[in-house]
C-alpha cells in the first residue's frame, strides 16, 4: 500500500518523481500473488499502470480520481472532531461507513484499509465494523481532552501534506483555536518555501 507521494524525503530524493521511483522500487520484491494498492487521486501514483504484469488496485474519492478506481467514496459528511461518515463503493457492493477519526485524509486511510481487507477476504460487515472501531496512536490525530480544552496531538514526523491535513482538522473544531507548529525536516532545497506555504495555509 502506498498512500501518497508527498514532500517527505526531498532532501535525499530531490523531487516527487524521485520519491515515486524510490517507493515503487519495493514492487520488485512483491511475491507472485502479491497485490499493489495505490491512491488513485494522487497525481504521481495514478500514473502507475502495471506491476509485474498486473494492474494495481486503486482507491479514491469519487470525482477526484485520476484513474479508474476499484474502491471509492462519496457523500463524505464531517462530524467535527467526532469523525465522519461516507458511502464506500466496492466490488462487493456499497456500504455507509463511520470513520471515528477526523480529517479527510482518514477517509483515504479507511479506503486503503478497505482494499486490503477485501484482498484478504473480509466481508463488508467485518470491514465496516473494523473501520468504526479504529483508534489513533500517539502523535497521529490523537485527541486529548483536558479541562476546558481539546489538544489535537498530530506531531509525529510532520511534512507539508500532514501539516495541512492537521490544520484542516483543527479548522473543524469549535471555539478558539491555537495551532502550535514545529519544524518539518528532510525537505531539501525547498525547505523555506514549504514552511512558508504551511504558514500561509494556517
Model-inferred region functions:
Residues 1-51, 186, 190:
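Flexible active-site lid/hinge loop adjacent to a nucleotide/diphosphate
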Residues 3, 19, 37, 73, ...:
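Residue-level signal for inorganic ion chemistry
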Amino acid at each position: 500500500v502506498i498512500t501518497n507521494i508527498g514532500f517527505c524525503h526531498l532532501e535525499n530524493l530531490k523531487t516527487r518523481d524521485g520519491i515515486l521511483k524510490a517507493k515503487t522500487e519495493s514492487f520488485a520484491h512483491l511475491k507472485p500473488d502479491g497485490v499493489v494498492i495505490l491512491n488513485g487521486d494522487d497525481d504521481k501514483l495514478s500514473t502507475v499502470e502495471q506491476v509485474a504484469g498486473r494492474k494495481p488496485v486503486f482507491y479514491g474519492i469519487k470525482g477526484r480520481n485520476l484513474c479508474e478506481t476499484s474502491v471509492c467514496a462519496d457523500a463524505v459528511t464531517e462530524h467535527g472532531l467526532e469523525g465522519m461518515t461516507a458511502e464506500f463503493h466496492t466490488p462487493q457492493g456499497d456500504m455507509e461507513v463511520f470513520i471515528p477519526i477526523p480529517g479527510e485524509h482518514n477517509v483515504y486511510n479507511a479506503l486503503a484499509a478497505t482494499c486490503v481487507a477485501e484482498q484478504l477476504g473480509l466481508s463488508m460487515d467485518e470491514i465496516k465494523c473494523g473501520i468504526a472501531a479504529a483508534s489513533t496512536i500517539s502523535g497521529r490525530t490523537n485527541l486529548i481532552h483536558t479541562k476546558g480544552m481539546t489538544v489535537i496531538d498530530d506531531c509525529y514526523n510532520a511534512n507539508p501534506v500532514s501539516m495541512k491535513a492537521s490544520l484542516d482538522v483543527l479548522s473543524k473544531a469549535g471555539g478558539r483555536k491555537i495551532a502550535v507548529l514545529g519544524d518539518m525536516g528532510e525537505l531539501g532545497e525547498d525547505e523555506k518555501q514549504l514552511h512558508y506555504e504551511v504558514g500561509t495555509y494556517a
